[in-house]
Amino acid sequence: MSQKPVNDGEIKTEYLQKVAIADDGSWVIGQLFYIHEDGGTWIVRYAPYSKEDRYGGEVVLAHGVDMSNLREGDLAYVRGEIIKESRASKYVGGPLYRASSVTLNERVD
């Protein structure tokens, strides 16, 4: 993966009014981040760190979904389900999320 980190994990200002999660977790709109530890993990961040949220503002994508057309920093629409409510990884605090689809909403610059 030849992508450079986009920032410190905070959502881009222009995305803040566009990110959200369904009450039942069936969809998430968020900014994509990539954690390189443990063979690589994709995070979908849908709330800023400053906002109180039951999942800490992020979900951790379970392996198996095709992310080849997406980049770190993109805004994406993700459909699926939370499959493990507790912390999914020792590196991040969000729950594990099984995505059935990930669609690009906006490409990072």
Report each predicted region and the residues it spans.
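Conserved RNA-binding domains used in RNP assembly and mRNA/RNA metabolism
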Residues: 1-109
